[in-house]
Structures are given as C-alpha cells and as structure tokens.
Amino acid sequence: MKKIKIAFLLVATVLSSTLVSAQGTKEYTVDGIKVIHKYVPKDVISVRLFVEGGTANYSKEKQGIENLTLNLMVDGGTTNMPKLDFKTASEKIGTSFGASTALDYGSISMTCIKAFWDQSWNLFSDAILNPAFSENEYNLLKEQLIANAQQTMADPDGSLDLLARQIAFENKDYAKAYDGTPESLAGISLEDVKNYYKKTLGKKRTFLVVVGNITEEDLTAKIKASLG
C-alpha cells in the first residue's frame, strides 16, 4: 500500500494527479526492478528512480545524508565522466537531471527529448551505477547544503515547519530534517556517503517510473543492459 501511495505521488509530480489511474499505465518487473511505465505520444520523456524509506533510512545524527548522496550522484560526475564533461554532454542534448528528498522517499530524475533518449538514458544509468564520489565535489556540495540549511533555519517559515514536526513526531522519523541541519551535515563524511549509497541504492528499496513516448520493449532492454 505504501509503494502504491509513493508511486502515485511520483507520477503526479511528473505529469498530473490523474495519471496513475489513466489507461495505458503499466506495472512490471525487469531483473528485480519494479517499473511503472506510462506511454504518452509526446516528445518529452521523464524518468525518476525512487528510493523508498526517506527519513527511516538514516539516524538523527545523519540527517541530510540522503540529500547529500543523491545530489552528489547527479551533480558530482561519474567514474566514466568528470563533472564538467557530464554537464556538457547533458546540456548539449537538452537533458536535465535532479535529485530530491522527502519524509518517505528520495529520488533521482531525468527529463529529455525523444530524439536524445538513448544518450540521455546512458547518462542517467551512469550517474546511478558509477558515481565518482570525488572528495573535491563532496566538499563543495557539502558546503552548499550546509549554507542552505543555515538559511532554512534563519527563515521563520522553514524553521517553524521543522519545529512543528519535531513536536508532533517527537522521537519519530518524521521529526528528522531530511535536507539536513548544519550540524548533522557537518558530521557526514565521504565514507558515510559511500556506505549509504551501497546500503540504500539497491533493487529492494528502489523502483523506476517512466513517462513518455517509448515502448515497453525499449525500456526493458535498456534496464537489462544497464540497471539490471
């Protein structure tokens, strides 16, 4: 039931809140990876890898580790392509990548056009399977996220939201700051990030949602060749 709820939220983010129940949405499994696939005859393709668990995946001391890990995966280069090369390759074909976290889930997303689907998928799967996790990019991103957390704490609305959850869900997972606090982020090492990636980014905790002008056969072949 929880998976269905999460899937609904994800697809709603990609298109609209009515998409899940629309005709043409399929659910299937490819080499142990759950796939939710919606075919639409448009040139824009949206892909998102969902990581289940959210705040339940880490301790209070490691708040923000999922945020740091996922963003480093999409914005820190891979073992095959340094950050600048990866960014240049994606910008050249108009493909965008993103990462986000929430109370119950985290995700890595990609949006591309049909003409560059093959190249975009290769970049997407490379970011998921072969993140570089370089110390330099880790330090740069960590400093940025700490600055963001400090700004959130200084903002009345941002700090009020966290305080309300801490009171309502005292000693529960929902009381955690999924973006991290300045203190928790400062205490997360690069080794922590690598270990979190190995522990969390597996088939049991993830599933894929794809919306666009691609066939089940094409998507299945790509998953088997890369993520499977």
Name the predicted role of every residue range:
Residues 1-5, 88-228:
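Charge-rich, well-structured scaffold segments of protease-associated domains
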Residues 7-18:
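Bacterial N-terminal signal peptides
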Residues 20-24:
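Boundary at the C-terminal end of the N-terminal hydrophobic targeting segment
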Residues 25, 33-35, 206:
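Short, conserved active-site loop motifs that form the nucleotide-linked donor/cofactor pocket
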Residues 29-55:
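N-terminal targeting signals for Sec/Tat export/insertion, comprising classic cleavable signal peptides
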Residues 42-43, 55-57, 79, 114-117, ...:
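Solvent-exposed loop/turn segments at secondary-structure junctions
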Residues 48-111, 177-178:
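M16/MPP (pitrilysin/insulinase) zinc-metallopeptidase core fold and M16-derived inactive scaffolds
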